[in-house]
C-alpha cells in the first residue's frame, strides 16, 4: 500500500518525467486501476494533420491539475467533437469512445484507467482529414490487446508513417500525411 503523499511535491521532484518524449508516468498500477500523470505538450502531431484515435473498451477518468487540455472524440461514430477540460475540471470518458488527448505546453493531468480484461481489445484508428466526408471515415484500424500502451503504439504508428498505401482513404482516395 502506498502511503499518502503530497502530489505537488511529487510533481516538483519528477517534472522531467512529464515532458516530451516521455510525457507520462505511471503513478499507481493496482489490480483494477492504473493512475498516470501526464504532461504536455504532446510530442506527436496527431491532432493537426492526421486524426488518430485510441478506442479503449473501458472508461477513462481525466482530471486536469494544471492548465487546460483538449480531448478530441468521435461521438456516436458520426461526429468529431472537441471537449475542453479546464484546470481543476474532471471528465469521465465512456468506454468504446474513440479519443485523442491534446495536451499543451506546461500542463499536467491525471488519467485513471481500468486494467484491461484479458479478452479486451483496444483499437488504434486513423481517420481521413482530407476528404469531404459526411461522417468520420476510418482509413486504417489496428486491433490489439493492450498490455503496455507505451511500447505497443510505437511500432503501429511507425508502420503507418512508412507505408503510404496504408494511409490511402478507401472512400475518397486521398493519402493522409504520415504525421
Swiss-Prot record:
It is found in: Cytoplasm. Keywords: Cytoplasm, Dioxygenase, Iron, Metal-binding, Oxidoreductase, Pyridine nucleotide biosynthesis. It comes from the Eukaryota. Coiled coil: none annotated. O2 binds at residue 44. It comes from Aspergillus oryzae (strain ATCC 42149 / RIB 40) (Yellow koji mold). Belongs to the 3-HAO family. Fe cation binds at residues 48, 60, 99. Catalyzes the oxidative ring opening of 3-hydroxyanthranilate to 2-amino-3-carboxymuconate semialdehyde, which spontaneously cyclizes to quinolinate. GO terms for molecular function: 3-hydroxyanthranilate 3,4-dioxygenase activity; ferrous iron binding. Signal peptide: none annotated. HAMAP family: 3_HAO. One of its GO terms (biological process) is 'de novo' NAD biosynthetic process from L-tryptophan. Pathway: Cofactor biosynthesis; NAD(+) biosynthesis; quinolinate from L-kynurenine: step 3/3. Its EC number is 1.13.11.6. Substrate binds at residues 60, 103, 113. This is 3-hydroxyanthranilate 3,4-dioxygenase 2. Its cofactor is Fe(2+). It catalyses: 3-hydroxyanthranilate + O2 = (2Z,4Z)-2-amino-3-carboxymuconate 6-semialdehyde. PANTHER family: 3-HYDROXYANTHRANILATE 3,4-DIOXYGENASE, 3-HYDROXYANTHRANILATE 3,4-DIOXYGENASE 2. InterPro entries: 3hydroanth_dOase, RmlC-like_jellyroll, RmlC_Cupin_sf. It is an enzyme of class 1 (oxidoreductase). Pfam families: 3-HAO.
